[in-house]
């Protein structure tokens, strides 16, 4: 895919059924991916609800040379903007040298990013928060942040997204 012009590949996203894979299965696949010449082009989804497991998984991924992550807020419980801001803050305070694409997918995790929360995260963590995958489709039409990638999560939103200045798409 990358040889054909794709900028990167998301690994362990929702289509890849990340929530159904154990951490050991994910690590096993990451070990295989370390052999790829495209390692810097992989966006590693965490797919974990536990903050500590997410932080530990990022540590392991970093030790294997991966630094770009697709991170969804934890699922199941109802979280507000402050909870989500604190979740990402704790991750970034532990791993300040990573790049994060926020994963906005309310149907899967129960939380939909507000533009205010995204703006606050980017303002506070400009070097780490580099984009958002918008699978809830409430951000790609209105969010405007310099040097920030907005990536709709569906082919049906691609053309309109590109017309509105989106960077591309993350899709199956």
Predicted regions and their residues:
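Active-site beta->alpha loop and helix N-cap motifs at the rims of alpha/beta catalytic domains
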Residues: 2-112, 118, 123, 129
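Catalytic alpha/beta core domains of metabolic enzymes, predominantly
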Residues: 92-94, 105-172
């Amino acid at each position: 895919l990358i040889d054909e012009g794709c900028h990167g590949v998301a690994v362990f996203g929702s289509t890849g059924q990340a929530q159904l894979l154990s951490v050991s299965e994910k690590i096993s696949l990451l070990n295989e991916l370390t052999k790829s010449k495209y390692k810097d082009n992989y966006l590693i989804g965490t797919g974990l609800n536990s903050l500590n497991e997410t932080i530990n998984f990022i540590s392991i991924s970093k030790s294997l040379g991966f630094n770009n992550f697709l991170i969804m807020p934890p699922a199941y419980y109802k979280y507000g903007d402050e909870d989500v801001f604190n979740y990402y803050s704790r991750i970034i305070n532990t791993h300040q040298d990573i790049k994060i694409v926020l994963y906005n997918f309310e149907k899967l995790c129960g939380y939909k990013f507000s533009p205010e929360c995204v703006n606050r995260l980017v303002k506070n963590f400009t070097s780490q928060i580099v984009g958002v995958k918008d699978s809830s489709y409430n951000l790609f039409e209105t969010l405007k942040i310099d040097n920030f990638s907005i990536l709709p999560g569906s082919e049906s939103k691609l053309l309109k997204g590109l017309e509105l200045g989106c960077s591309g798409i993350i899709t199956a």
